[in-house]
Amino acid sequence: MKPRLLNSFRGYRYRYRYRYGYRRKKPEIRNIDKGIIHILASFNNTIITVTDVKGHVIYWSSAGACGFKGPKKGSAFAAQKATESVIYRVVIKRAAVLITGCGKGRDAALRVIQHNRIPIRAVVDITPNPHNGCRPPAKRRV
């Protein structure tokens, strides 16, 4: 086994973080004129993404990123908190909402957007629907 250098830069970095902690960036509030709010509501999690018209991601959040773990990530309350965290960081003058998935968080996220008085141009459900494509997985037997 190779002996490790005590004065290596890697060791210094870890010692510095141990002593002084991580430096946290302050959250920036971003202003955009037109934007698209993508809501991906699966049964296990809800992911909210704000993009500009070209599709470049400006900010995103999810129920897991807001501190929820396990089955609580799929709840409507977790989706509400994730949407609030996005809306407080991004100021949008006009928005279109694209909803994907059929989880519990889709209605809760849309309700938060409407409650914060963001002018919504369109609400579109873009959940993929197979025209008899792949065979679905077998049903669970408990």
Swiss-Prot record:
- List the coiled-coil residues: none
Assigned GO CC terms: chloroplast; ribonucleoprotein complex; ribosome
Q: Does the keyword Plastid apply?
A: yes
Q: Which GO terms describe its molecular function?
A: rRNA binding; structural constituent of ribosome
Q: What is this protein called?
A: Small ribosomal subunit protein uS11c
Q: Where in the cell is it found?
A: Plastid, Chloroplast
Q: Which gene encodes it?
A: rps11
Cited PANTHER family: 40S RIBOSOMAL PROTEIN S14/30S RIBOSOMAL PROTEIN S11
User: What InterPro entries does the record tag this protein with?
Assistant: Ribosomal_uS11, Ribosomal_uS11_sf
| This protein's record includes keyword Magnesium | no
Q: Which domain of life is it from?
A: Eukaryota
One BP term from GO = translation
Organism taxonomic ancestry: Eukaryota, Viridiplantae, Streptophyta, Embryophyta, Tracheophyta
Assembly and binders:
Part of the 30S ribosomal subunit.
- Identify its protein family: Belongs to the universal ribosomal protein uS11 family.
Origin species: Welwitschia mirabilis (Tree tumbo)
One Pfam annotation, family name?
Ribosomal_S11
Kindly state which keywords UniProt assigns to this record, in alphabetical order.
Answer: Chloroplast, Plastid, Ribonucleoprotein, Ribosomal protein, RNA-binding, rRNA-binding
